[in-house]
From Swiss-Prot:
Nucleus is among the record's keywords: yes
Name of this chain's protein: Transcription factor bHLH53
Keyword annotations of the record: DNA-binding, Nucleus, Transcription, Transcription regulation
Main location: nucleus
SMART domains: HLH (SM00353)
Subunit annotation: Homodimer.
GO annotation terms (biological process): regulation of DNA-templated transcription
InterPro entries, sorted: bHLH95_bHLH, bHLH_dom, HLH_DNA-bd_sf, IND-like
Species this chain originates from: Arabidopsis thaliana (Mouse-ear cress)
């Protein structure tokens, strides 16, 4: 049993004295099945005296432990099977100038102060239970406030760097905007203008204007001569109101004229004096008769 106790404390790297291995302030509870024998001391008194014949010999050592002990060290007792009748209060095992005794490893103890030591050369990392490590403090820093509004494009700072437009550029933009608006309106007036691009629409607009001028002249001539029945006038008005017929006539660069009026034009002296006009009128009449 003494070898077991010594081998436990000699696992440390530095040499440890047995008196340093004693644990003061340890709450020990000795079970009824264990017994301990110590050297007699005047100040220690037990309720039951040790018998002289059961006292351990001071010259008895374990052969294995002899090499670790000096003659000045304490002697470890040999325990017997003697049983104490009652549990003794061992609080009187406090640090004293006298050497202390080691007890059997089968005792029970309170683990709260298990590694406390009064020896200043023995470092106990778990003894000082009142030590509280200081919490790590970090320097406080303030996070800048960011705007939650998301702006697409240039920000407020970019507005100051935006180049200013000259008066000529502003006027040119205004002209282009007005041209685009007028072109859109013109496309609504020309028959089939929504199917044309800008260049084709301008050409169709020029032809449509010529068609309107010619058609208006024929209608005025019909009113002055007052030739033709009312049915012809109504039929002519009905045809000219159609957008499809206007688109067809303007594309072919012709106008609508009643057949009776064409026949009357052949008898006019002014037309007969102009061979080109007379020739065109004869072609129209020949086509009409062929149909």
């Amino acid at each position: 049993m003494s070898m077991d106790c010594l081998s436990y404390f000699f696992n440390y790297d530095p040499p440890v004295q047995l008196q340093d291995c004693f644990i003061p302030e340890m709450d020990m509870i000795i079970p009824e099945t264990d017994s301990f024998f110590f050297q007699s001391q005047p100040q220690l008194e037990f309720h039951q005296p040790l018998f002289q014949e059961e006292a351990p010999s001071q010259t008895h050592f374990d052969p294995f432990c002899d090499q670790f002990l000096s003659p000045q060290e304490i002697f470890l007792p040999n325990p017997k099977n003697e049983i104490f009748n009652e549990t003794h209060d061992l609080d009187f095992f406090l640090p004293t100038p006298k050497r202390q005794r080691l007890v059997n490893s089968s005792y029970n103890c309170n683990t709260q102060n298990h590694f406390q030591s009064r020896n200043p050369n023995f470092f106990d990392p778990f003894g000082d239970t009142d030590f509280v490590p200081e919490s790590c403090t970090f320097q406080e820093f303030r996070v800048p406030d960011f705007s939650l509004a998301f702006k697409v494009g240039r920000g407020d700072q970019d507005d100051s760097k935006k180049p200013t437009l000259s008066s000529q550029s502003i006027a040119a933009r205004g002209r282009r905007r007005r041209i685009a608006e007028k072109t859109h309106e013109l496309g609504k007036l020309i028959p089939g203008g929504n199917k044309l691009n800008t260049a084709e629409m301008f050409q169709a607009a020029a032809k449509y204007v010529k068609f309107l001028q010619s058609q208006v002249g024929i209608l005025q001539l019909m009113q002055t001569t007052k030739k033709g029945s009312s049915n012809v006038q109504m039929e002519t008005q009905y045809l000219l109101e159609s957008q499809a017929i206007q688109e067809k006539l303007s594309t072919e660069e012709v106008c609508l004229v009643p057949c009776e009026m064409v026949q009357d034009l052949t008898t006019e002296e002014t037309i007969c004096r102009t061979p080109n006009i007379s020739r065109e009128i004869n072609k129209l009449l020949s086509k009409h008769l062929a149909n």
